Amino acid sequence: MTETIRERVGWEYYYYGNLPYRRGDPGWYTFDNRPRFNNNYVGLRNRMAILSEAYSYATFEERIMATLYFVEEILNHAADQRTAIEQVIATAEAIPLAGMDLGVRFQPSMNQESVEILMGDVETLRNPYSGSSYYERKDTVYTQTMPEWGAFEPTETARAPAHYVVSASAASVVGAYLDTHGVIYSSISEADERELEAFTIDSTTVSSREFQQIFERTLFGSSSSKWVAVEEGSLIVSTSQPLGRLVFYLLEPRSDDGLVNWAQLDKWLEPGKDYPIY
C-alpha cells in the first residue's frame, strides 16, 4: 500500500508513531496496547481494524487527501485479500484458549531493526491576535534513523481457564457488561460446591487521578485451588467461544483494562477476601 500511494501521489506513509520528546528513550513509539482504544478492542473480537491518522503539521487539505488515499488503499487491499482475511478470522475464532498463558499486562517491545523516519522542522510564531505561540511547519524534510517500538510484549501472564464462575452476588453487574459485549454465558440453577481457582486479594491500589469519572484500580494477590460454595444465580462464562479472548481480558483480576481496572467491582474487592470471579 505504501508503494502504491507513493507511485500514485508521491507521498510517504508509515505505521503510526510518536517521538517522546519529554521522556523516554528516543525512538518511534506506537500507541497504547489496551483495548480501550477501538482498533485494539476490535482485534480482541477477532476482527481487523486500522488506525488512520494524518501528519499533525500537514495542512487541512493535505490531511483530508492523505486520509482518503489511505482508506481507499486499505479497502482495495482488503477486497483483494478477502479470502485470506476470512481464513485468519476463522482460525482465530477456533483456537482453544483453555490452558494458554495470555498477557494481562504489557510493555512496548523494540523491533530488532532500526527504521528511517522522515522528519521535518517547525518554527515558533506568535499569534497576532491572542499573543500565544504556535508552530508552523517549515519546508524541510530529512531522514533520521532510530529504534522502533512498534509492538508489545507481556510483562505478566495468566493461564486462561476453560470457564469462569461469577459469584451470584456479582452476577447482575458482570452479566450486564457481558451482554453489552455480546458474550455468551449461562446461569447456574442449583447451588453446589466446586473445586475452583480462587484469587485471594492481599492489597489494592487506586489511581490518584480521575479518568472518565472513575479511579482506575489494580489488584494484588495470589491464586490457589479451593472448594467454593457456588450459589444459584452464579454465572458460567466459557472461554470456548469466539469472544473468548475478550472474556479473559474483561474478567481476569490482574487485567490492565478489565472490569477491575474500571472500578466496576469495587464493592467486592477487600483484602483477605476472594475476587468474586473464579
Language-model regions: role of each:
Residues 1-278:
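Structured catalytic-domain cores with a bias toward divalent-metal coordination
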